[in-house]
């Protein structure tokens, strides 16, 4: 099999195009890895936000030549070109690649300036594709037009398992369409519908997703950040969770949920035995909401493994109550509390949990330290999805402590 770097150089000279040094460097490293481990599958990782690799971000024309290089390469199972400038031109060649390269199971096109037209091309390519498992379109403004075509695609495609359309400027019509399609689709295990463009205060998106969760028993992971969700919307989801037996990871961070919403959530957690990861970060559940949760976690729930209440206006009493629940509930292993109001009792409580070994340092976002015989807590770079938007450019690319949600509920191989 011809080396990737040599094939790329040949295609550039044949089409009278300059080689991109960034792509050359990545393909050279990949060739070396393939030579060492010829039977393994590899992902081509050409992230445009990698500061250690000098070179310009790749364009649609660059991606055209790269996609031709990758054809008929059975050892390539993934393509990650996040944070580049491939645009709708690159989306055209990405669609061609999906049609002609059956070994690809993972495609990451996040933040690539792809619009509705590019979204349409990729969605249509997936009508007949039977191998792609995970697609990330995060941050590409495909809008309502592109989003509706992806929803239509899910009626035809029975192999895609995880789809990320976060920050894609989807409209309410799209959210309703996905909710409708997912009542029938038996393949999708994870979906991200973060930050749709919604108008009005009626919380229609959560009502429709709630109806879908009552019918769908395949979906494992659901992200609904920035839906403008209030307590009524959370109540709709909680009503669905009484009937749902598959959802293990629920992300409702960055919404408008308050203490009253925790009454519904605490109640459903008494009987729901499926949910394992719950992200409530950047809401406003306050001390009362934390206490509702801690009561359920102490006396009833024995299935939740990870809870994030980062930046929720919780004071010491609520944080201590959550720490106390961990002493009796031995299933809850991960808790994230940074951004709340720590008092000395809070610092002592979490310091004791860590020192006793009940709470592992990798499973929380705080670390105790002492000054003048007083204990304080500092922030640690751990969380449920710290590497959702970016990945480190050195050391381990995947750290379970920084992406605990995906480590506890793995849907697909990649973030």
UniProtKB/Swiss-Prot annotation:
GO terms for cellular component: cytoplasm; nucleolus. Highly expressed in stem cells where it may be involved in regulation of pluripotency. In embryonic stem cells (ESCs), important for normal expression of the pluripotency regulators POU5F1/OCT4 and KLF4. Also important for expression of the ectodermal marker gene NES and the endodermal marker gene GATA4. Promotes stem cell proliferation in vitro. Expressed in testis where it specifically localizes to germ cells (at protein level). Not detected in other tissues tested (at protein level). Expressed in pluripotent embryonic stem cells and multipotent adult germline stem cells. Pfam families: LRR_6. The keyword Coiled coil does not apply. The gene is Lrrc34. InterPro entries: Leu-rich_rpt, LRR-containing_regulator, LRR_dom_sf. Keywords: Cytoplasm, Differentiation, Leucine-rich repeat, Nucleus, Repeat. The lineage of its organism: Eukaryota, Metazoa, Chordata, Craniata, Vertebrata. It is found in: Nucleus; Nucleus, Nucleolus; Cytoplasm. The keyword Secreted does not apply. Its main location: nucleus. LRR repeats lie at residues 246-272, 274-296. This is Leucine-rich repeat-containing protein 34. It comes from Mus musculus (Mouse). One of its GO terms (biological process) is cell differentiation. Disulfide bonds: none annotated. Interacts with NPM1 and NCL. SMART domains: LRR_RI.
């Amino acid at each position: 099999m011809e080396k990737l770097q040599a094939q790329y150089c040949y295609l550039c000279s044949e089409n009278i195009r300059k080689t991109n040094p960034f792509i050359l460097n990545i393909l050279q490293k990949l060739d070396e890895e393939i030579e060492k481990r010829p039977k393994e599958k590899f992902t081509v990782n050409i992230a445009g936000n990698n500061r250690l690799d000098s070179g310009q971000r790749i364009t649609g024309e660059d991606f055209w030549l790269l996609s031709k290089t990758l054809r008929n390469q059975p050892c390539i199972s993934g393509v990650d070109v996040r944070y580049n400038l491939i645009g709708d031109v690159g989306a055209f060649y990405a669609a061609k690649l999906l049609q002609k390269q059956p070994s690809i199971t993972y495609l990451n096109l996040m933040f690539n300036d792809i619009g509705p037209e590019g979204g349409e091309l990729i969605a249509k390519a997936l009508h007949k594709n039977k191998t792609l498992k995970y697609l990330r379109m995060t941050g590409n403004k495909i809008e309502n037009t592109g989003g509706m075509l992806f929803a239509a695609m899910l009626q035809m495609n029975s192999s895609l398992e995880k789809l990320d359309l976060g920050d894609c400027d989807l409209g309410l019509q799209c959210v309703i369409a996905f909710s409708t399609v997912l009542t029938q689709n038996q393949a999708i295990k994870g979906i991200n519908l973060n930050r749709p463009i919604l108008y009005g205060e009626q919380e229609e998106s959560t009502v429709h997703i709630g109806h879908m969760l009552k019918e769908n028993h395949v979906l494992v992971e659901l992200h609904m950040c920035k839906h403008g969700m209030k307590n009524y919307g959370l109540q709709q989801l909680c009503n669905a969770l009484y009937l749902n037996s598959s959802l293990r990871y629920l992300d409702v961070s960055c919404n408008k949920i308050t203490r009253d919403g925790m009454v519904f959530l605490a109640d459903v957690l008494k009987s729901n035995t499926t949910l394992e990861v719950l992200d409530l970060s950047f809401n406003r559940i306050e001390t009362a909401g934390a206490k509702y949760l801690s009561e359920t976690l102490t006396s009833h729930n024995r299935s939740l493994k990870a809870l994030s209440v980062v930046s929720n206006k919780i004071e010491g009493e609520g944080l201590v109550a959550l720490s106390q629940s961990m002493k009796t509930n031995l299933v809850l292993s991960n808790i994230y509390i940074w951004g709340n109001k720590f008092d000395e009792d809070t610092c002592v409580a979490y310091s004791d949990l860590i020192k006793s070994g009940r709470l592992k340092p990798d499973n929380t976002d705080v670390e105790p330290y002492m000054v003048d015989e007083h204990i304080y807590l500092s922030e640690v770079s751990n969380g449920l999805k710290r590497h959702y938007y970016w990945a480190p450019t050195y050391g381990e690319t995947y750290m379970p402590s920084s992406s605990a949600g995906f480590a506890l509920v793995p849907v697909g191989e990649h973030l």
